[in-house]
Amino acid sequence: HIEKGTVWQPQWAGVTFEQKMKNMVGDLNVCSKKGLSERFDSTIGAATVLMPFGGAYQLTPQNAMVAKLPVDGETSTCSGMAWGYNPYLMSANQYVGARMAVIESVTKLVATGFRYEDAYLTFQEYFERLGNKPERWGKPLAALLGALDAQIGLGIASIGGKDSMSGSFEQLDVPPTLVSFATAIGKASRVVSTEFKKPESTVVLVRPIIDPETGCPNFFSLKANYKIVENMIEEGMVASACSVGYGGIAEALFKMGLGNRIGFKMRADMTTHQMFEPMYGSIILEMVSDSPAGMLLGETTKEYTFESCGEKLDMAELQEIWESKLEPVYPYRKAGPAVEKINGSLTAPAAPKIGVAKPKVIIPVFPGTNCEYDTAKAFARAGADPEILVVRNLTPADVAESCEALVKAIDASQIVMLPGGFSGGDEPDGSGKFITAFFRNPVIKEKVHALLKERDGLMAGICNGFQALIKLGLVPYGEIIEPSADTPTLTFNTIGRHQSRLVNTRVASNKSPWLSSSNVGDIHTVAISHGEGRFVCPKELFLSLIHISEPTRPISI
C-alpha cells in the first residue's frame, strides 16, 4: 500500500531576504558542523586531496570527500564520495525523496570533478517498525522505487547498502530514511573545491529542466548538464563549484564565500523565493574564464557582503550566526592564551660526524601504528633508505624476537623513526605507553644511547611516536630516563576533544638537525590529528628549553 506523497518546500521565517538568511544559516541542517567534523581524522595516510573545510579560514564545507588511493608509490588517481538525503522531503514523499537523494549525491560528485558515468551508489535505509500496517510497508517500497527510477534515469547502479526496519521506540518513529552515497574514481588534477577563490569572478548557475509532474529534474537535461560541467572542469574553466541543495542558491553562495571571506553581488533578477528554493541537480560555478553555458548569477566581491534582492547583508554577521548555533555542543573556536614569541638561531652547522650518502632509517611498527607507509615514503622521497620492522606481540617468543630484530636494525641504521597511530590502543589510560615500555628494554635502551651519543644518529617521532619520545625522556633530554613528577608530557587538548585540522606552525629555533635548513620565523601549514597535543612541563624546564636559564640536564631540541 503506497500512499500519495505531498509536496515539500522549506518555509524560512521572515519577510525580507535578511530575515530569511539569518534563519536559514542558523538552521540545524545548514549551520556549521566543524566542531563535530574535527573529531574525525581527515589526514591519515597523507593522501587527502580535499580537507573537510576549504579556504584559508577552513570554513567552506566541501561537496565530497576525496583522497588518493593508498598505493606503494606515487599516484594521481583518487576516489570521491558524496551523500544525499533530505529527511523533510522523504517524510513528505518517499518516492521523490529517494530519487532526489540519488540526484543530490551524484551532483555533488560532478561538482567536485568526477564523471557521473563513473559513479556507483550504495544506500543506507532506515525505516520505522513495519508491523502489520500496509501504509508503513509502502514507505520503504516507494523509496526503493524512487531510487531505482533515478538509477535507471542516470544509467548508474547501486552495488550494495544496508537497511533496517526497526526505527521505532515506543511512540517515536524515525523519519523515512534512504541516504544515497555516490562514489567514483577520478584524477586529483580534476578535483574542484567549493570555496570561492578570488574577488571579481563570474558566477553562473547550471540548472536542469524540472518535470512539472514530479518536481524532479528531467534526466536527459540533468545528464546533459553534467556533461557540460565535466567538460568545463576538464578545460580548466572552473575555479570552484557547489551543488545546490536544501537551502537553495542562498545557502550555496553563502558557504562558498566563507572559506576565503569573499563576498557576492547578485546580478540576476532573482526573487526571495527563488533564492531559497531547493534546486537539487543544480550546480553553481565560479568561472576562471567566460562560461559557455549556464545562467549568470553575479560576481564575487572583495567586500565581505552578500548583496541580493535589493539588500546588502554583512557576511561576518551571518557567519557568526552560522558558527555559533552548535558552538555550545561542538566547540571549535576556543582560543588559548597568548604566548610569547620565542626566537633561536643556529650557532653551529648541524651535520653528522660520519657522512652517509643514503642514511638508513628504521621504522618500528607497533600494534595500532597506522602511518608507517607514508612515513617511509616521505623518507624515501628525501633520499633516505627506510625499512619497516613489524613488532610482533602475540606470544612472549614473538616479543623477544622483535626486540632482537630491532636491536640489529638500530645498529645498522642512522635514524630511528617512531610513526604515529594508536599503539596498544592507547591503553592503559594514555598514548604511547606500549612504545615506551618496549624501548625501556635495557638492550634497546643501550643501542638507542649508542646511536645518539656515539654514532651521532637521529631520532624522530610523529603523533603517537612523538608522545613516546617525550615520555621516554628523549625529548627534551636526549636520553631515555625514568619518569618523575616533573617529567614533561603531552596531555589532553584544552578544547576537551580530539581535533583534526590544518594549523600554522612557526619555526622558533633551528638548532635541531631536523630544522637546520629552516629559518627562524618560517611558517608552515601542517596537518594535526590528536586528542593529546598539549605539551606541559615545569616552568624551570621551559625556561631551560628556551635558553633563558641554564638547563638542569643536557637538553636535546
Regions found by a protein language model. Name each.
Residues S166-S168, S189, Q467-K471, Y477-G478, ...:
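Short, well-ordered, mixed-charge alpha-helical segments that flank or form enzyme active sites
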Residues K198-P199, E235-M237, G259, P278-Y280, ...:
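Short gly/pro-enriched beta-turn/loop segments at secondary-structure junctions
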Residues I546-I557:
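Single conserved hydrophobic/aromatic residue that forms the stacking wall/gate
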Residues E213, S240, I249-E251, L469, ...:
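Short acidic/glycine-rich loop or secondary-structure boundary segments that cap or lie
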Residues G113, A485-E540:
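An acidic, glycine-rich "communication" segment
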Residues F114, V244, N464-G465, G531:
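Conformational gate/switch positions in structured elements
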